[in-house]
Amino acid sequence: MKNNFFKKTIILLIFLSIFILYSNADEETITTPPGYYGLKRIKRFPHSNIESNNISQTDADLYYPDICAGALPNAEGDLMTFYTFLDANLTLNKFLITKESIYSFMVHSLVILPGGSVTIKRGLLFFSLEEYNSLNIINPAKFPLDPMGYFPGILALGGSLTLIGNYPLIYSAQVLSKTTLRISPPFSSIPGDNINKLYQIKIFSDSNPLGSLCSIIMDSTRTIVNISGCPPIGNEKVMKVAFIKFTIDEMNTGISNRYSVKKIDESIGASIFITGDTKVHIENFFINGDGRTLNEEYNDHKLIFSPNNKNIVTDIIKGSNQRYRNSLYIEFSNNAVIKNCVIFEKDPRRSPIVFFASNVEFTSNIISSYSGSNLIAQFGTENIRSKNNHYFLVPYSRSLNTSAKSMDYGYEGGNGLYSLSPNIKSENDTFIGQLNIFNFNFISNRSSVTSFDRDCYAPCYNDSDSVLSSVQRPVDFYLINPKYFKISNITLFNSTIFNLFVANSNGNQPNTYTINGLVAIGPIVANLDSNFLILKDFIATENFKLDGSVKRLDIINSSIELPLTSKDIIKNVSSLSTNIQNSYLYYPSNDSVEQLKDQIYGSVITPYYYSSPITLDRIKIVSIYPNSPLQVISGLTFNIVIQFRLIYAFQDIIICIFTSDNDSIQNRTVDFNVLSNKCILPVSVGPNKEGSANVRVQIKNSLSSDYLYIIDFPQITVLKTYTFYSGWSMANPDLANQQFIVNGSLFQSGCQTKTDSNCTISENSNYVPNLPNVTSSDELNSLFSSGVTSLNSNEPVIITTAINSNSTISQIQLFFTHVPIDQHASLLSVYIDNQPVYVLEPLQSNQGPTFKNITFKYENTNSLEKINIAFTTRGDIYLTSMAIYSSNIFFIPPIIPDPTAIPDVPANENTLNLLTIVLPICSAVVVASSVMLGRLFYKKKFKKFKSADIENEMTTIEPIETSNSNIENKSESIATPQQRNEQKEIPNKIHPVLKSLVKPKIAPYTLISPLPPLETKTPEALNPHFNEIGCDPINENPEINSDEQIVLPVDTPQISPDSPQHSIPSSSPPPPPLPLPPSTSLKPLKLPIVDSFRTSSFMFRLERSNLIELSDPNNPLRFSSKILDFNLKGLKATLFKEYSNFLLISNISSSTIFVKVILPRDSRTGNVGYNVHEYF
């Protein structure tokens, strides 16, 4: 009977094995117990420079059955059991066996060895040899079994596999009635009237994510389809249909396990296993494989080798749940394309698709499964581009414990894309039924998981770069426009849990994770305790919220389109630092917006609150200033500026209402200037003011009570000035007596590991000499020539240093040199007594080594004599030196000029005031480097100069400079030797005893940006002077960053954040300037300076100089030339030849002007020459 059954059904069974005719020298033959195929052992990972570490449970070697050696001969009669193809290339296109009908091409195993090439344009059905053996009806010999469990299925070990169907499978559908659909594009692939007889459609929707198989009647247009034999169509929110053959035969374009020999309608598991850098192209195929990897804990087959011979297997233990036996599994493939396919898995499984260390293009597919995940990227080096796919999922969960060594991931039950990889890109994908759309898991020291100590990110070739498995590069998530729909069938899905994005870090080193361009349609969970999360170009819509734990959170260039304040956004996120910049937050005008004042100093939370969605269409914010925490010296002036564009023509005046919580900055209403598109608030800080101010501006229609925008500026701190106390250089610790004198201030070398030193350093420090120059000053380069970093990446280097116990407030200044080791940013964190000052600040330079200066305040309320300073980096940022400033050491008052030396002046003027103007002068010989001009006038006349200067809106340098002081008083924080001798309160010896440390109140200050590289021979690069805090030594007007639409001073570094649990003190000391080269020997001027100007932004700054153009109507002088080039016209000067030039200066005012010309140093005497001209 059984024999008659097979004769009637005329089933053709063909065993395929494709291999090339040369042997592989790397293969080893393994002997197995009777009843099994022998095995071949090959290197699993084709990269020649990456070797196994032999510590992982994941095999670095791959074993596959030697089926060609054990193939049985064909039996006589109607049934062919096996064919072994010896050709290197094979195309399976059409199989027609004519007896009673046309039947399918059935396969047990298809093997492609390296070099082989297989193209299949028709469908394949798989059957089980174990079931066939149990029948034992035709051939008495039993077929050997696969000891590794690859079959039934396809095993590709190299070469290429091409599965391409002849017509598209997937169509969009519009519901016309409960039984009628309109499909697009028209189904025109099959001619004639056989469509209704030969085809069915499978409808995938949010009510039936596993699909309904329906019979069809199609009209003549091939667009209208009437369905029957399936549930009626409901109110579907999303629907896709796939055309499949009514019976699986040779015309079907698919791979299926639909038939088995034992029972015609019983499914068996089949899988496609791709490895060995096989080139894969699968298009227009229906993959109904029901892979064999369950959503349970892995339990692999195990080979028991002989203790005396590694090439003999004595026993095989079959596992109950082998990994990597999914419907489609691709590993170590540099070129894999899956397009317009339907991948269906109806039984509970781990995932229908797993990509492992491969480069995959995954486009326009339908994935429907009852599984833990739709797709898993499970090695960590995958590069996957998912676009326009529909992921249907009925979550199937198991409570398992993640095991890193077994790489047992993706079973959680409800993941769309589950990944261990940083390079997963999703664009316009649609998800139906998931609990977590994107679930990323980053594990530390992946070598214990992958079997390899080094990684090579796909695509990976023999000559590709490899990196240590313990290194996690910065991660950029590109998750563009995802769409999500819940399952409407309550019997299939009854969970209220839904997360758009989940990221976990399992002990990784500090790293940066950036989510780019995401439209947030649901919650985001970030469990990245030691990491930096950036939301960039981010749009938050309905159901958005943010949960988890990060070390630093930045929201940049984003829009929150639901009523949330900054506090609402971050209330469920634990973070040390939060920054919200150039981002729009919707908040109704009838509700009050709470200003966040309890954040750390380094947090920049400056959202643009808008009252109504229509506001975005009427006003566009361009920039604000300040856009980072600003420090100003008391007694100075500066401007607060907001720039915006009016898109809508308002009938009434637009006003800006500035308010402050500190009387240092007065409340004021300012009209919007339609010419400059700005509201400018001039601020003049009193001479005795000190403290921090939080400033807010409301943009309003003058006749309306509702606001249009509310914007909070970064904190503005008014400072007083302290002076230099002590300095240390991280020079050779063996030269403890080595000293550096910079601008008269003494830096002592030799931080020791000894405990009795005034400067001790932890033993994990790595001393590095001969660091590259990062400034144009020889003295500073000498100070910065050596540095320390950690021996182990991101392990803190701790320095214990003495501090003035008699000073309540001190300042600490740290100088770092960054020498990049690759193109990726390095993260710098700084702590004082275990409290964060600077958190994960990214430093990156594409132009070589750069300089970083950090200054922060320390409140020594317990009169400590020593403090601990710690910093962490990945090993390419070096601390070169540090300085401490004390609040109870004051500047020496400037020398009062002798009034008898002042020349005679007209009777109506009893004071001679000096106005300084600087001109750029070009020459290759010693020439005049600046011209200083003075003029006489009454204070009331001088006011017009001050008001004109205030209108220079974005000037941040000049506001920090004082008036009515002598030019010799540079307000520097590093004292001269004379000043140090006169400062009697500095102790001669600092007590070495370390008292119990307390948690201080701290506030960091961002100082200057990295200096230009030395090879850049611009006037800026040749300037040896550093600017003060928040100042730009070259450009006076801040530059608008077009990418972020934020006004930034040119080259200003980003703000570094700090711990949120520490309040900011009400007062702060000044940020001391960097040490400068020794000052010139200029004699004190005998006239007080009223104000000073320079006439070019390319000219280096003289003290307290403002920028004024030569053509400015407020400029009382006219010059015959702007540049003195001594007629050289760019040529080099001849040695020992004298050159001359002249400058004609005309006074067009009624006041008397005093002119002083300052010349560069004399090369012989070392003195600075100057020449005094008469009044004119």
Curated annotation (Swiss-Prot):
One of its GO terms (cellular component) is membrane. This is Growth-differentiation transition protein 5. Residues 965-985, 1050-1080 are annotated as: Disordered. Belongs to the GDT family. Residues 965-974, 1053-1066 have a biased composition (Low complexity). Disulfide bonds: none annotated. The chain crosses the membrane at residues 914-934. It is a single-pass type I membrane protein. It comes from the Eukaryota. Residues 1-25 form the signal peptide. Keywords: Membrane, Signal, Transmembrane, Transmembrane helix. Residues 26-913 are extracellular. It is found in: Membrane. Residues 1067-1078 have a biased composition (Pro residues). Residues 935-1176 are cytoplasmic. One of its GO terms (biological process) is regulation of developmental process.
